Amino acid sequence: MTDKPKIYVDSCCFIDAAKYQDASSAPADEQEDIKYIQQILKAAESGDVVVHTSSLTIAECQHTGEHPPTDEVKRLFKSVLTSGKIVQLVADSIFIAEKARDLRWDHDITLRGADAIDVATALEIGCKEFITKDGRGPHKNAAKIAHLGLKVIRASETSLLPEHHKKEKQNLNFP
């Protein structure tokens, strides 16, 4: 069992990190979050935090806007999501699916299917932060989700990234 901070990262963050490998090429209002995602992934690669995501993220990270995706984008998604060196994938299970359903039944948290699975996965494995830029489901329900012990935040709002990684967040390449 690890005592390292556990962070859940939503698929939209991986897509942006691959799309804007140079954070300065992103829209101005997204650059800080992209730099933080890059640092969170580097912190995970160095073992300072544990980054989790649902195995569903593999299916969601199909491209960064271009069709078909470039070989480099495919390589990045594979190396980050399935190498086991940066991100710890969590397989869906009946327990996670029931927890996703119960978000609505027991907690009045209304989320679409994939968002419910993501939040339930983060709760099931004990993550303290759920990082997303998706302003719809999880962010709209952030207060209710926080009552379950999970903060829904943008990457730049993380409190779990070690300070030495925060200082290194200048234009880094996606791992």
Question: What role is predicted for each listed range?
Answer:
Residues 1-53, 66-75, 170-175:
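Short, well-structured N-terminal submotif of metal-dependent ribonuclease cores
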Residues 11, 55, 112-119:
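Conserved glycosyltransferase catalytic-site signature
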Residues 13-16, 40, 53, 57, ...:
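Anionic, Ser/Thr-rich low-complexity intrinsically disordered regions
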Residues 27-30, 106-111:
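Short, flexible loop segments at the rims of nucleotide/cofactor-binding pockets, characterized by
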Residues 56, 82-107:
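Acidic catalytic patch
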Residues 59-62, 119-123:
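Short, hydrophobic alpha-helix immediately C-terminal to the catalytic nucleophile
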